[in-house]
Design a protein with these regions (language model features):
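Short, surface-exposed interaction patches in beta-rich subdomains
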Residues: 168-261
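Short acidic/polar N-terminal linker immediately downstream of export determinants
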Residues: 32-89, 117-122, 225, 229-240
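A generic structural signal for short beta-strands and their flanking turns/coil linkers
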Residues: 76, 122-124, 192, 213
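Recognition helix of helix-turn-helix/homeodomain-like DNA-binding domains
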Residues: 1-9, 32-34
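Right-handed parallel beta-helix
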Residues: 49-53, 57, 89-172, 184, ...
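DNA major-groove recognition helix of helix-turn-helix/homeodomain DNA-binding modules
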Residues: 13-28
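Active-site alpha-helical segments that house and flank conserved acidic catalytic motifs
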Residues: 60-62, 140, 215-217
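Generic detector of contiguous secondary-structure segments
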Residues: 8-15, 88-99, 200-211
């Protein structure tokens, strides 16, 4: 068509038909908004969207999940997407509730029809997209096998729950993680503070070889160790660095591992 060839404009009826086919709005079809959201490879999915008109703080309570992705994107809406390859009752058993309260947005994931948190931990994948220009402080409560936080630039992110693996990439923030599980934390890139609060846990934090940071431990009987090429080494933190890693809690250990190039 002339539209595809760049020599004309599309008929609105055709646009509406195409948008309906792909289950997106005409505005999204004409913009690049969807290009930042990878299309799902899952069999079952559910999406909830909400328009935002200004900067907001976010209080997100998800309960159990197999994996959670929290990421910023260039758009106008917050979107909560749920996926599963085995949970065919996804649409009926899980509902996202979004409340807009002045300068705060509350996001709650509610379970119905006796859907259990155990089921969610085995099969439920959640991705939350937040518009870059509207991101305030974020509080996230979740029990998940993996958590990925990507491209978020804000003042503070607080994560509470039971989490086994965390990956941080492209963020500029003060990130606080409160989890009493032994965690594997991977920092691919991050600017700012990373504060880890644990009770009787041993976690490993892997950082790039060229990542400069200063570190400190607080609390009671906490220890930070350092590892390079599979061997324990002396403290290689930099007291003059801007990036900051802190371990707090009781009877906990953090091993900071320099990734092999």
């Amino acid at each position: 068509s002339k539209w595809e060839n760049g020599t004309g404009t599309p008929d609105i009826a055709n646009l509406m038909a195409i948008a309906d086919l792909f289950q997106i709005s005409v505005d999204e079809l004409l913009s690049n908004e969807k290009s930042e959201k990878k299309q799902s490879d899952y069999i079952y999915e559910s999406r909830t969207e909400y328009d935002i008109d200004g900067k907001k703080n976010f209080d997100i309570k998800l309960g159990g999940a197999y994996a959670v992705d929290l990421k910023a994107y260039h758009g106008e809406k917050i979107e909560v997407a749920m996926f599963s390859n085995v949970y065919k009752n996804l649409l009926a058993d899980y509902k996202v509730k979004i409340d807009d309260i002045k300068n705060r947005i509350d996001i709650d994931l509610n379970r119905f029809n006796e859907a259990s948190e155990a089921d969610a931990k085995e099969s439920l994948v959640i991705t939350i997209f937040i518009p870059v220009k509207y991101i305030g402080k974020i509080e996230l409560s979740v029990n998940a096998g993996t958590l990925n936080i990507t491209d978020i630039e804000n003042e503070h992110i607080e994560v509470n729950g039971k989490i086994s693996e965390v990956t941080l990439q492209g963020n500029k923030s003060e990130i606080e993680i409160d989890s009493n599980l032994d965690m594997q934390i991977s920092v691919l890139s991050h600017e700012g503070a990373l504060e880890i609060n644990q009770l009787s846990a041993t976690s490993r934090l892997t950082i790039p070889a060229d990542y400069r940071f200063r570190s400190t431990k607080k609390g009671i009987a906490t220890h930070i160790y350092y590892e390079r090429q599979g061997k324990k080494v002396d403290d290689f933190s930099d007291a003059e660095a801007d990036n900051y890693i802190e371990l707090n809690g009781i009877k906990s250990e953090l091993v900071i591992v320099e990734a092999e190039v």
